[in-house]
Amino acid sequence: ESTIEYITDQLIDVPDIATRKMFGEYALYCGKKVVALVCDDTLFVKITPEGKDFVGDNYKEGFAYKGAKASMQIDEDLLEDREWISKLITITEENLPEPKLAKKKIS
């Protein structure tokens, strides 16, 4: 089982979870929002104040790729706790801004 399959299996109770392959790695969506990236078999969850409060000291800041914004790098042992990781992803989705719609170019 691949890392992305394992993570999506762990998030089975979270509605509207989807993945999209990007640049050889994966973006994890909850609804229309990108809530995390999976790069080099590691989960990087977008940082929100509410997510940081929930996680406490259970993460280190990491970068999914060179030039990326800092994210919460989640250790494998924390991924095993389905309820915990589902709650973190839900909190993250609830506290991220709505994605901006791309403006159509007028030619």
Residues covered by each model-derived region:
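Charge-dense, helix-prone N-terminal extensions
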Residues: 1-107
